[in-house]
Amino acid sequence: MVAVRFYAVEMSLPCLCPCPSSPISLSLCSPRFNLLNTTSRRLGLSRNCRTLRISCSSSSTVTDQTQQSSFNDAELKLIDALIGIQGRGKSASPKQLNDVESAVKVLEGLEGIQNPTDSDLIEGRWRLMFTTRPGTASPIQRTFTGVDVFTVFQDVYLKATNDPRVSNIVKFSDFIGELKVEAVASIKDGKRVLFRFDRAAFDLKFLPFKVPYPVPFRLLGDEAKGWLDTTYLSPSGNLRISRGNKGTTFVLQKETVPRQKLLATISQDKGVAEAIDEFLASNSNSAEDNYELLEGSWQMIWSSQMYTDSWIENAANGLMGRQIIEKDGRIKFEVNIIPAFRFSMKGKFIKSESSTYDLKMDDAAIIGGAFGYPVDITNNIELKILYTDEKMRISRGFDNIIFVHIREI
């Protein structure tokens, strides 16, 4: 007779201005998980790394301390609300959307730079972090911003030029190139910029010339026009909130905080181990480092792991999926296998020393629907918390593997 256990199971971008649809569609596909080779100075090992793409950004070269001081408390609250949101808002949960919108309203009610369109601080390149209504984008915009690997910028140059412009840039990668859609711009008042799209082109690294983007802007009339209000510009000039004529709200940044910089590196699949070392060094305070294993659902987005031939072994070692931490000392590893089926492994944890926990995992099963099929596997793991906050955790676990988890809301 086969023993069967029963479980109660809970089933569970836009361009920055309105741009007309195009008869051309562009599709760049990439797998959700990627293997890459990177060298971890912390571990002294060469490993294959597993990455879940997330939306984040970093373009600053200043130090982390300077970045941190560039934002006031209300701005940091908005930035904190953005941490872990995928697709620049496209995949945000209702709570995440509410947190971001609340933080946006607080900033819009504060006194930022008066008449931002007259300020030199609005000039330069801005990176799109979040949009509250990504569904209002045109089909070609959704093709670009719906894939996390793309980075979206906005260049604003209104003063000290005979050709004021607002340009939207979709950067595919450093090796492929970008698409730039340009608009003639004019200042209407202290907050509003009027624009009219008039040209666009692909700038591809492997071609010695630009490829025109075939959209007949002149024939589109009012569809190629719009306006953009800046409702908040930070005194440091590093954060901007804008609202477009389609009702969309945009959050843009010039500089980023340390967590955003690390998450951007993970998203780009380059130099992750080095970025983790840099982040940990900048956040280390040995006299106070005593991190707790915070409760909640934590999705793994990166690990310095070495894959084995057995996915179930990887799952049992916490090398994939999510960890669900409960405050009564219970923990669960959970991995989605195929639709309607997942691997679940339950256990308990106790704190053995500062920032270190002993995990005993001994209740594994393949779950399909409301039924659980036992798997005879046990595991003992020492988990060292290297850094944690309310949104992100860096830890060292099975076989000295480094993990980065994002807390799910």
Swiss-Prot record:
Protein name as catalogued: Probable plastid-lipid-associated protein 12, chloroplastic
Source species taxonomy: Eukaryota, Viridiplantae, Streptophyta, Embryophyta, Tracheophyta
Location of this chain's protein in the cell: Plastid, Chloroplast thylakoid
Organism: Arabidopsis thaliana
GO CC aspect terms: chloroplast; chloroplast envelope; chloroplast thylakoid; chloroplast thylakoid membrane; nucleus
Key words of the record: Chloroplast, Plastid, Thylakoid, Transit peptide
Residue stretch of the organelle transit peptide: 1-55
Keyword Protein biosynthesis: no
Family: Belongs to the PAP/fibrillin family.
Pfam families with a match to the protein in the record: PAP_fibrillin (PF04755)
